[in-house]
């Protein structure tokens, strides 16, 4: 292929896929660009959310590669062990240098881009492309007492705030 487009890789599919693409490219003498679409903050935060689930507060302590803060804050499922494993994984891939092979990182918002740009390795590679939908003609509809939420039902998505606002 001329381009390999990866989305979030984690758990069973690790960044090792990047090394395999580079290995194939070298073996075949075929240039292959790697594009990565970031749907979370995995590249700069071991728990992927930049949020401490124990406190509910936004957190940037790991930004800059200070991944041990994930362990200190028990940021992965409130577990020291799971957080330490996440810290080791993030540190391994950082030290391994695998991310230097990514040619372009697509961020789904300018905010995400600004956070990934804190890593000098990513700064010249990021681009913000918002998720998109076709523009539809808006129709006035009668107001009713319900809401529609489409997304993962989890605390960090702000479900509690949405419910509070609707009361």
Residues covered by each model-derived region:
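Carbohydrate-associated surface elements
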Residues: 111, 132
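A short beta-strand/loop micro-motif in the catalytic core of glycosyltransferases
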Residues: 35-36, 100-110
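A short helix->loop->beta-strand "cap" motif at the edges of active sites that frequently abuts
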Residues: 24-34, 123-124
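Conserved donor-binding/catalytic core segment of Leloir-type glycosyltransferases
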Residues: 106, 139-157, 163-167
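Short aromatic-enriched loop/helix-cap "lid" or pocket-rim segments at secondary-structure transitions
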Residues: 17-18, 45-51, 56-57, 72, ...
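Membrane-proximal helix-turn-helix segments that form the acceptor-binding/catalytic region
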Residues: 23, 42, 54-105
